[in-house]
């Protein structure tokens, strides 16, 4: 089972939209499908997979799609080093970024409660992207 969700945050008030999906594909196949959908939909829409627990033959992942301000690229952290809260704060202040095309889908990043704020003007277009993603993802599985 996989959980797909988009995390929006405007100022300090988060608006969360989650959709649970039952998936019968093994994780690598799902990663490839979702990676392709993200590239097609919106380069500002970034994908994160969080392993939650191991099931027989499958992994349960939380797919968290974080939407960022147009001038900020997403911040990735490798699975070997989970960031502390002070690391996250300094990373946000300095706007450290890395090109999403060179990053691995298995990278672990900040969770939805620590996502960066997004402007209201971008919110409506991002909701449309999420709905398109959900529809395409359901068709793919």
Curated annotation (Swiss-Prot):
Transmembrane segments annotated in the record for this chain: 118-140
Compartment annotation: Membrane
CC annotations in GO: membrane
The entry's keywords: Allergen, Membrane, Transmembrane, Transmembrane helix
Keyword Metal-binding set for record: no
Protein origin, superkingdom: Eukaryota
Gene it is expressed from: cop c5
Protein name listed in UniProt: Allergen Cop c 5
Membrane disposition: Single-pass membrane protein
